[in-house]
Amino acid sequence: PILATVLKEILNKNKINNTQLLNIKKIIKKINKFHEWLIQFRDPKKTGLVSILHPWESGYDNSPLWDEPMKKVKIEKNIKYKRGDNKVVNPDYRPLDIDYDRYVTIKNNLKKMKYNPKKVYKSSFFNVVDVGFNSIFLKANKDLVILLDKFNLNKTKINNYIKLTEKNFLKLYDKKKESFFSKDIRNNQKIFIPSITNYFVLFADLNNDKINKKLIKSLKRYNPKNKYFFSSIKPNHKSFEEKRYWRGPVWINCNWFIHKGLKNKDWFFSEKIKKKTIQILEKKGFFEYFSCKNGQPMGAKNFSWSAALYLDLMLNKN
């Protein structure tokens, strides 16, 4: 849910005429409705934290974050589907067939409920409060408030939700490990997997300097021995796989989120991440993801979000 953040950036960097402003106001109203929809249907208990109901909603499909919740998904009998992803990309880099069995099982269950938002929260085979998703949503809500204020639209509901999120986000923090961890709502279990997405909290600008400093300290220990960073999973963890999709490789968007989040907290570290990210793209090409050990490019070639974020890093000096 990053639309509000992107739109705020567009408005900050461009001259907008009156006709465009009218259209943008309509877009902001639609974004506001989307955010209110997420709050209503993905956080029915009003905790300040929204759930994802399928690993695909996170964007990091086969992350080890989902291993335990997914193990509890009973695969549908006689399940039928055709994979195309492992035909165009090396299968060793892609999720396993058993992963897809579970993805499709979850999807088919949602389909049986006709994706009714009132039903799926309770009945989905997968229900996780993800740190990464909620970090992006918190930042988007903060940016949405700025947009609503700019166009004299009501911001009370979103403002109140931000306060609730700021308060309850801390329940996901582990003092000993100095990191945030997602929670499996369906099985009522914390997910103690060292994923780089746990550090997206820095992007959310959580109003807690003490925790932010501890997060940065922890992040600097994440994979210091590797030339390329950040690996999607901490390299010394048992679930780490150097080349398999979201189980180890470096993703440009993860670096981008953390670079942006550190700019007003540790500028030098932020610039280091920016420099290293630009270097790997210029040296290895615009691929989907890369090995943290040797920078080997993997996945799809000419990958658009790698290219788009490269442009953003190159053109944004602030």
Residues of each region from the PLM?
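Well-ordered alpha-helical scaffold segments within catalytic/enzyme domains
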Residues: I2-T19, S135-L153, F200-K210, W256-W267, ...
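A generic secondary-structure signal for well-formed alpha-helical elements
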Residues: L7-K15, I31-K46, N141-L148, N152, ...
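Extended, well-ordered alpha-helical scaffold segments
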Residues: N18-L38, A140, F151-L170, K210-Y222, ...
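Extended glycan-interaction surfaces of carbohydrate-active proteins
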Residues: T47-V128, L164-V250, K276-N318
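Internal, well-ordered domain-core segments that constitute the primary functional module
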Residues: I2-M70
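C-terminal transactivation domains of fungal Zn(2)-Cys(6)
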Residues: M113-N168
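Short, local alpha-helical segments
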Residues: S239-R244, N255-F257, G261
